[in-house]
Amino acid sequence: MNLLSLLLILLGIILGVVVGYIVARNLLHQKQVQARQTADDIVSYANKEADNIKKEKLLEAKEENQILKEQAENELRERRGELQRQETRLLQKEENLDRKSDLLDKKDEILEQKESKLEERQQQVDAKESSVQTLIMKHEQELERISGLTQEEAVKEQLQRVEEELSQDIAILVKEKEKEAKEKVDKTAKELLATTVQRLAAEHTTESTVSVVNLPNDEMKGRIIGREGRNIRTLETLTGIDLIIDDTPEAVILSGFDPIRREIARTALVNLVSDGRIHPGRIEDMVEKARKEVDDIIRDAGEQATFEINVHNMHPDLVKILGRLNYRTSYGQNVLKHSIEVAHLSGMLAAELGEDVTLAKRAGLLHDVGKAIDHEVEGSHVEIGVELAKKYNENNIIINAIHSHHGDVEPTSIISILVAAADALSAARPGARKETLENYIRRLERLETLSESYDGVEKAFAIQAGREIRVVVSPEEIDDLKSYRLARDIKNQIEEELQYPGHIKVTVVRETRAIEYAK
């Protein structure tokens, strides 16, 4: 290899290195440009994403702020509405008081005017009476002067003349009255017989306000109470009956003034003890089952009463209402047994007097039917009984017997008189009634009725012998704040309207349940 070839090779290598360097530099520059462009794109995209996220967060914050604002406005609007309603009620009460005050003022003015007029009339009457006495004295003196007779002689002569003139009229009147008396003798005899009857021998048991459920062992008491008392609390809330668990061995006492509720509670507790499964869900099932059993017992009692009295073709609903009387007492006297007794007495009296025996028995059996629902419907038991008899198409004589047996209206038939007499005899029989128990029950019924008169109250139970009223409210209508207000209102009304010994505890129960079924 010569020198020229080496130079050419060396030159080629140098050219290759230079060209490679230039190419590599250009490639590096292009990559730098591309990398810078990519970085700019990434930064731009990141900025856009950041802007989008920022906008979304701002929108979410604005929406949340708007929701909170609307909620606050709604709450404020509700409070303002409540305040306006309270203000309206206060204004109405103030207007009513003003109207009553005006009426009282007007009545006072009218009374004063009447008193003034009466005084004027009294003065006028006194003046006229004095004038009349003066005239009488003048006439008497003039008559004595003209006739030459004294006052006593003139009066005696006048009486003799009047006696002679009336003697014939008196004789005629006596004959007419004798004839009229003979025509009415049958009716008069029947009415007299209706007041003189013998008492019917019947057995009554004074109803108590407690029932006792026997237990297999004392361990069952703990199961009835349940964890933290939830079982006993559930049973008391569902039935309205107090469960008294004390040192009495193998026994639980049920206390309540309503015999139907007490029987439902007793039946449910007996079934729970027999079943052995005692928890709130099972208690609800057993109480509902017990209600159906007691309904059947009530219906059977009504049918048995109609069978015993031999009364037929009575509406089934009326028979069931009649059966409810087996769980009602009047002054300690079982109302259904009292009604059966009145029916027997009325039937025997009707037979003696020749009246319709079947109709008299039917009237006697139904005379107190209004007492079966008088704690559920407004009005006296007489008014309710009349409405029931009309509703179920009973005879007009029976309707009048119900309406008149306490003297609210005049009796229109002998049967009505007989029913009233039989009712009085049954009630007056020694040992038939007890005043104290009836007054106690009426007080508890009044306590429950007063509590149930408020809106949103589903039911109310007087427990602890009337020392506590437990009020169950609808959670949709009564919230927590209104619950406190309701308890205070009931407390104030009890203090104003009722008389009672000691204190009465007002408990408002508000419960919300959410139930779903997994399939």
Swiss-Prot record:
EC id: 3.1.-.-
Family membership: Belongs to the RNase Y family.
Location of the protein in the cell: Cell membrane
KH domain location: 209-269
Pfam families for the chain: HD (PF01966), KH_1 (PF00013), RNase_Y_N (PF12072)
Domain HD: 335-428
Protein name: Ribonuclease Y
Membrane topology type: Single-pass membrane protein
Molecular function terms from GO: RNA binding; RNA endonuclease activity
UniProt GO BP: mRNA catabolic process
Function: Endoribonuclease that initiates mRNA decay.
PROSITE patterns the UniProt entry points to: HD (PS51831), KH_TYPE_1 (PS50084)
Domain of life: Bacteria
Gene Ontology cellular component terms for the protein in this record: plasma membrane
Keywords per UniProt: Cell membrane, Endonuclease, Hydrolase, Membrane, Nuclease, RNA-binding, Transmembrane, Transmembrane helix, Virulence
Major location (coarse): membrane
Transmembrane segments: 3-23
